[in-house]
């Protein structure tokens, strides 16, 4: 809070109570319920008044003295200081006459006493009736807050690292044109006193607040038109004054009497650089450098000419304008001669001589112009475009500079060629669909064959038909030509039709789905063919194209299947053949024992009944899943194994009125009825 008078201090960091304390210590009346931004504005005004407190209104007071014709010339400066030291109300300043509102001397160059109690008036901020966020104090447009403050001495507010010596001193009155003032004797004496007691020159911290001093008729031009040589980086609102350089020439002496020429050139260059930094050029880098040198030379020339009487009155802008006009005239003459040489040389591709030329003493190796792209230049100054391009002449072609004329693509012809191309593709697609899917394609083929005797030959196509293989039936170009000719619009001429047809053929030859030569054309694409026909044709073509591969796959698959089935059947037969054949033998023995005990049954079992008992009638092989072929193979193996037993006889016998093959056990039967009964009730080993 102690360093709030520092211009770099941010007042927003202070609390409201701190702001009120500052206002109270400064003797400023303030509203109690105002917003923080209002307190910040009031404190900011106090800080600005303290920073800018200086001899601001000396000239206004002097002019008031002149207008009132008072004779108070002997009054001291301390007595009149409170009257002009601080600004008055803005509403009153607007009513001053013209001679008071526009002083000849800037009030910022006047001294101010350090310790003087003066009233400081703070203007109310700009308000708007439409702003609903402003307080009551902002809505009163004519409210002015008056406060009385005591300006501390220079050393009181100076930081420790700064010098206590004040830099604000009176401005030398030699910088002002006193001849322009129609003053009283007292006013003239006061000006002489101020000019004789001050020998300092101003240094501005900011170029924006510098004031133009009017030139005196008796003073040297170097004193009032000389720009400041030191501009600090930090921009402030106040003005500081530093002593003049000891090498600066006096008013009565010549500019070159006390200063060396080398030092003066260096000083002039610094002044010129300072002016250029304030007004930066926006031209190209090369042109900027050239203009930089020209303007510096002009600046130095004008400075040297001011030493001669009569010449110093010439304005520098006039010489710059004259120099630029002369430079433009020289450039125009040079361009005119260059244009004439270029037209004489012509185009480089037309056989024109490429010898060197000289313009205003400048030698050029060759001035011939390059022929524009897509153009033919038969003569030095004549341009002819290639087919498919038209000549375009821009607005600057009358000037004769390149590129004056060039060839552009003919958009209307390109559109017509694209229309012909799409129509040719549509016709070829319809013919391709008829050829592949329709049953009435014989008429189209007959028409196509009729053009073989007198074929249409495309001369603009440089395609050899020796190495071209057509994927399908090709069509004659004459058939396509006549088909499009039948569809031609009546407004299209025959010559234009022939030109567009040949151009469309050249475009079609670059299409991937079209294969053609100078006489035949073939469309190799499925576009325009129905889906069902397309799938059928694609499948047939695929099978026919890969028939060898597909046949090999089928044969190999069959062999593999047979081998797998063979080994599987063999494993099943090897697993169940012993138990099944033993079951058949045991069944024959039981049948023989039952026959011997009861004499009521036949001692034989038919093979058909044995097969059913074995595979279906709760036999040992009923729960085994196998194919019919495997079951048949297993039964054949069982029959062969049982017939190899010597005690089993196979014969033909009548069973239930039908003759069939039967098996009979003829060997010794060791089974009796009890064992047979127990055998029947016992679960077969094949079921386990």
From Swiss-Prot:
InterPro entries in alphabetical order: HeH/LEM_domain, Heh2/Src1, Man1/Src1-like_C, MAN1_winged_helix_dom
Transmembrane stretches, start-end: 318-338, 547-567
Record bears the keyword Phosphoprotein: yes
The encoding gene: lem2
Origin superkingdom: Eukaryota
Pfam families: HeH, MSC
Function field: Nucleus inner membrane protein involved in meiosis. Plays a role in regulating nuclear envelope (NE) morphology and nuclear integrity, particularly during spindle pole body (SPB) extrusion or insertion through the NE, and perhaps during karyokinesis.
In-chain residues carrying the UniProt-annotated modification Phosphothreonine: 683
Name the UniProt record assigns to this protein: Lap-Emerin-Man domain protein 2
Region (Disordered): 62-113, 202-227
CDD domains with a match to the protein in the record: LEM_like (cd12935)
Compartments where found: Nucleus inner membrane
Low complexity compositional bias, start-end: 82-92
Species this protein is from: Schizosaccharomyces pombe (strain 972 / ATCC 24843)
This protein's UniProt keywords: Meiosis, Membrane, Nucleus, Phosphoprotein, Transmembrane, Transmembrane helix
GO biological process, one term: attachment of telomeric heterochromatin to nuclear envelope
Location of Phosphoserine modifications: 684
GO cellular component terms given for this protein: CENP-A containing chromatin; chromosome, centromeric core domain; chromosome, subtelomeric region; mitotic nuclear bridge midzone membrane domain; mitotic spindle pole body; nuclear envelope; nuclear inner membrane; nuclear membrane
UniProt feature, compositional bias: Polar residues: 212-222
Membrane topology qualifier: Multi-pass membrane protein
Disruption phenotype: Modest growth deficit. Suppresses slow growth rates of spores and severe nuclear envelope (NE) morphology defects of vps4 mutants.
Keyword Membrane attached: yes
GO molecular function: centromere-nuclear envelope anchor activity; centromeric DNA binding; chromatin binding; double-stranded DNA binding; heterochromatin-nuclear membrane anchor activity
